[in-house]
């Protein structure tokens, strides 16, 4: 009988890879990680690349260093495979592109954070109605209030730029004086000059406006005595009138006769808490116009001395 021969070993038809070439070639061949690059036993480096859709290799040349061989492989890969080429090294153009992309991403992130900070500044810088605004015609300044008032009264809020701004301490008028009309006739110089009549109407606010919105004052805080003497005649040339009651209005005239304004009566009485907006810990009074006023007497500088 014929003896059975063992089956012949199949020849390795697989592709040669770097893993199967360990220990072969030059001393640095095993540590080289570049694609298509290998070292000869005498130390030279060679580069070769496979053609797309083919199994043949293209010889690229012999080089002194592995980096030069890797650069030759990258150039051939870009020509054969285009943008899908797998490169060994990052070339200066690609490196610059990567840096530009990183800068763009960083700048995009920075612009987002900058936009966020800008919104915060806008929020912190919101106009809460505490600023000053100067009138368009005249030498008066306007202090806005914490409360929104009717349109009929918003344009009449003017205070003296050089005065003491104590007009908000005036006693409240009776309900019968809800509306006051001041007629002023101004005449202009010249033979053909005529006169014009200006009418101003003021309406008092509701008596318990502050008490409806803020229940801050009760008990001993309800009333306190403030003596105030009012001059019968005072100069209103630098002011547009009192802040709330508008008892007098001055109409500028161009060389004509002076207008008649009603005189203020001397009043001494109680100052209602409705006229105040807030009393802080330092004894400062905040009026409806946003004015910060101190008490005229030292004994009333602090709230705990009011009892």
Curated annotation (Swiss-Prot):
InterPro entries: AP2/ERF_dom, AP2/ERF_dom_sf, DNA-bd_dom_sf. It is found in: Nucleus. PROSITE patterns: AP2_ERF. One of its GO terms (molecular function) is transcription cis-regulatory region binding. CDD domains: AP2 (cd00018). Residues 8-21 have a biased composition (Basic residues). Pfam families: AP2. GO terms for cellular component: nucleus. SMART domains: AP2. Residues 33-90 bind DNA. This is Dehydration-responsive element-binding protein 2G. Belongs to the AP2/ERF transcription factor family. ERF subfamily. Transcriptional activator that binds specifically to the DNA sequence 5'-[AG]CCGAC-3'. PANTHER family: DEHYDRATION-RESPONSIVE ELEMENT-BINDING PROTEIN 2C, DEHYDRATION-RESPONSIVE ELEMENT-BINDING PROTEIN 2G. Transmembrane segments: none annotated. Keywords: Activator, DNA-binding, Nucleus, Transcription, Transcription regulation. Residues 1-27, 235-257 are annotated as: Disordered.
């Amino acid at each position: 009988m014929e003896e059975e021969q063992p089956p012949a070993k199949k020849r390795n038809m697989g592709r040669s890879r770097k893993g199967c070439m360990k220990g072969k070639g030059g001393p640095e061949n095993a540590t080289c990680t570049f694609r298509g690059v290998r070292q000869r036993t005498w130390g030279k480096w060679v580069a070769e690349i496979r053609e797309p859709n083919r199994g043949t290799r293209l010889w690229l040349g012999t080089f002194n260093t592995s980096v030069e061989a890797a650069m030759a492989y990258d150039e051939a890969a870009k020509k054969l495979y285009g943008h899908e080429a797998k490169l060994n090294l990052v070339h200066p153009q690609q490196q610059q592109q990567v840096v530009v992309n990183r800068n763009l991403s960083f700048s995009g992130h920075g612009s987002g954070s900058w936009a966020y900070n800008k919104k915060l500044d806008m929020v912190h810088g919101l106009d809460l109605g505490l600023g000053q605004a100067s009138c368009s015609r005249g030498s008066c300044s306007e202090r806005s209030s914490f409360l929104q008032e009717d349109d009929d009264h918003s344009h009449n809020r003017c205070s003296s730029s050089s005065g003491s701004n104590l007009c908000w301490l005036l006693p409240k008028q009776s309900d019968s004086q809800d509306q006051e009309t001041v007629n002023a006739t101004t005449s202009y110089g010249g033979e053909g000059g005529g006169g014009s009549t200006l009418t101003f109407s003021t309406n008092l606010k509701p008596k318990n406006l502050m008490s409806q919105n803020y229940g801050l004052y009760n008990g001993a805080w309800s009333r306190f005595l403030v003596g105030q003497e009012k001059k019968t005649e005072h100069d209103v040339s630098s002011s547009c009138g009192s802040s709330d009651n508008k008892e007098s209005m001055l109409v500028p005239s161009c060389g004509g006769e002076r207008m008649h304004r009603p005189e203020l009566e001397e009043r001494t009485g109680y100052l209602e808490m409705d006229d105040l907006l807030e009393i802080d810990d330092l004894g400062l009074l905040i009026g409806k116009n946003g004015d910060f006023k101190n008490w005229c007497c030292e004994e009333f500088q602090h709230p705990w001395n009011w009892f």
